[in-house]
Amino acid sequence: LVSVEHQAARLKVAKAQQLAAQLPAMCRLEGGDALSASQ
């Protein structure tokens, strides 16, 4: 049986990895919008 602490830690890591994966795409989108707006 997986302990609650272990489950919570795994969930936190998964969330952090998900955020880390989304950040570059978000930055690229915002950067692209800013570039197209300035032109």
Swiss-Prot record:
Q: What does this protein do?
A: Glutenins are high-molecular weight seed storage proteins of wheat endosperm. Thought to be responsible for the visco-elastic property of wheat dough.
Lineage at the top is:
Eukaryota, Viridiplantae, Streptophyta, Embryophyta, Tracheophyta
Further remarks about this protein from its record: Glutenins are coded by several genes on each of the group 1 chromosomes of wheat.
Please tell me whether the keyword Acetylation is annotated for this protein. no
Q: Has the keyword Translocase been applied to this entry?
A: no
Assembly and binders: Disulfide-bridge linked aggregates.
**InterPro entries linked to this entry:** Glutenin
Record's keyword terms, sorted = Disulfide bond, Repeat, Seed storage protein, Storage protein
* Record organism: Triticum aestivum
Q: What is this protein called?
A: Glutenin, high molecular weight subunit PC237
What GO molecular functions are on record for this protein?
Answer: nutrient reservoir activity
Family assignment? Belongs to the gliadin/glutenin family.
